């Protein structure tokens, strides 16, 4: 069974959320049921649940790892928006 570390973006508040799940679709749907503004912007898949939990913990505890990932996500979103503007 695969395990996932994911990042959601709240389109209304621009807040990012880090989570862990073994069923990514179901977990994202649960977030969206509470607040439809959440959207999946990034995820990592792991064969080991322990590895995924450790990665989630690292991102939440170590500011440099989370900061690096946030910059990566932001660059990706900026490029996507630029592409959408050209269409």
What are these regions (language model features)?
Residues 1-60, 64, 71-87:
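GIY-YIG nuclease catalytic motif and its immediate N-terminal context
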């Amino acid at each position: 069974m695969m395990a996932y570390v994911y990042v959601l973006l709240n389109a209304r508040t621009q807040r990012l959320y880090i989570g862990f799940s073994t069923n990514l679709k179901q977990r994202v749907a649960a977030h969206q049921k509470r607040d439809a503004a959440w959207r999946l912007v990034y995820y990592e898949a792991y064969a080991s649940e322990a590895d995924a939990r450790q990665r989630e913990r690292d991102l939440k505890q170590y500011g440099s790892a989370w900061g690096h990932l946030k910059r990566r996500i932001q660059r990706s979103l900026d490029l996507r928006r630029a592409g959408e503007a050209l269409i």
